[in-house]
Amino acid sequence: KDLEKEFGLTLFKRKNNVLTLTQHGKYLYDLSMPLIQEYNNVNERMNDYINKHSTLNLGIPPMLGTFLFPPIFNVFANENPGFQFKIKEYGSFANKKAVLDGEIDIAFTVTNECEVGDELEYIKIGETSLIFAVNKNNPLASKKVISANDIKNTPLILMKEDSLQYQIITSLFKEQNITPNILLTSNQFYIIKELLQSSDNNCGAFIFKQLIKDGENIIGIQFEKELKLDVLICYKKDAKLLSTTKRFIEFIKNNI
């Protein structure tokens, strides 16, 4: 009413306690939106300035974070001094749930299918694939390609059930009516790598191809069905993103 009095125009239609914009009101609304957006931007920037340290709650699958996150962190931290990350190491499925629950702002994740959903926004940032890894002295190390039948008796180390890797591998065995010999499930990639490095056991694990390094005792073998995956970041769709989250998303879009 104050605005209507000030401008001498009817801005709202009032009927049964419901307000709708008149043509004059719609015009004022359109004029005001850029000002409101700019105010929100100023407010966010001032909050960052006052807090000095910006914090981003980030979810990363343990194995993916081993090779993907360090170079991203190094460049972003240099460009954004005072920026802080709080990292949660969850599997891909748990990461998505944590974003939806508001526990984390952004998650890195992997998928073997096109991700479309009503609740999460996805940005593809790369590709990888799972390969079978064994110690170089393992009898299987000489193989160029391997099948589920070849490793049906091999003690397997898998990530935990909340990971896409676990779901993919157990499904592959199930399709061929083979029960995998799961020795251990762990989200600690350091443990998995140490077990593979040791020649005292004949265990194997499915790991990302980028984790096979020259000079190590671990050999990577292509699985008969190529296990290609897309690497993504995801965040809550239609949510009011903090400036810290927006800044990181823009960095990923422009640099990855």
Language model feature labels by segment:
Residues 6-7, 28-50:
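Alpha-helical linker/hinge and terminal dimerization helices associated
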Residues 51, 55-80, 84-88, 93-96, ...:
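N-terminal winged-helix
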Residues 30-31, 71-75, 92-130, 134, ...:
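Short beta-strand-centered segments that line the small-molecule binding cleft or hinge
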Residues 155-176, 241-249:
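Secondary-structure junction motif
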Residues 116-123, 128, 190-238:
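Beta-alpha-beta core module
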Residues 120-130, 134-156:
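Flexible hinge/capping segments at coil-to-helix
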Residues 4-21:
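A short LG(V/I)-centered, amphipathic sequence patch enriched
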Residues 91-92, 98-103, 110, 164-219:
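Hydrophobic hinge/microswitch elements
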